[in-house]
Amino acid sequence: MVEVITRDDLRAEIDKGSVTVVDALPAAPFASRHLPTAVNVTKEDSDDRVAEMLPDRAAPIVVYSTDSNCDRGPGLAERLDAGGYTDVRLYRDGIQDWADAGLPLDRSS
């Protein structure tokens, strides 16, 4: 089972640079806005793409999607956990919670 992380804990880890943040949404929503430092990987991506984007299976990873009603984040987090990634957590409240708190978002150029 994947552990859930809070917004405040995730923000602290992003600030320290101690976590790989993974946006589980499709490419278009990711391009329009995403959490700082996030990479885009979806549950539909091939195993090769996942391995390319997340090569270190022991690295701390936090996965998020839209909000607690979206199944993309939990689905990807469970896939990573089952695939041998050893430190996967889920930011269940997602990008909507982050944005509602007024925290910074990035966009792809």
PLM features per residue range, with description:
Residues 1-20, 24-63, 67-109:
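Rhodanese-like catalytic fold shared by cysteine-dependent sulfurtransferases
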